[in-house]
């Protein structure tokens, strides 16, 4: 379950940012992240892990806003573009592998138009903390 490692990274990164900016007496109310579709992250598991890892910190109780970035592939040979959803039926058996190693999806894909294996992942592997919102703490 790599959702736990994502959640820990989110908490650690925001805590570092708070310290760096001298924001010691604040309560984080929202954390905004973008995560690629190819990571196959379960948003419920991610939120649960975030909730657990943020206990006792300024992030406790913060909303975790998750934007899932859709995948996009391009064939280097013919230029055709497509998404993960377009080829999901062919990849269904490999979902557990893709879940753990999203970068391997490139090795499992062929262009649906020309059948070339020269495929580039344009988007869908992101993990970005876009920002966070906070308010002054009364504590």
UniProtKB/Swiss-Prot annotation:
Molecular function terms from GO: nickel cation binding; zinc ion binding
Signal peptide (UniProt feature, chain positions): none
InterPro entries from the entry? Hydgase_Ni_incorp_HypA/HybF_CS (IPR020538), HypA/HybF (IPR000688)
Positions contributing to Zn(2+) binding:
75, 78, 111, 114
Key word Metal-binding present: yes
Question: Might you name a Gene Ontology BP term for this protein?
Answer: protein modification process
The lineage's top-level taxon is: Archaea
Annotated positions binding Ni(2+) = 2
State if Zinc is listed as a keyword: yes
Instruction: Please describe what this protein does.
Output: Involved in the maturation of [NiFe] hydrogenases. Required for nickel insertion into the metal center of the hydrogenase.
Tell me the PANTHER family matching this sequence: HYDROGENASE MATURATION FACTOR HYPA
Q: Which family does it belong to?
A: Belongs to the HypA/HybF family.
Name of this chain's protein: Hydrogenase maturation factor HypA
The upper taxonomy is: Archaea, Thermoproteota, Thermoprotei, Desulfurococcales, Desulfurococcaceae
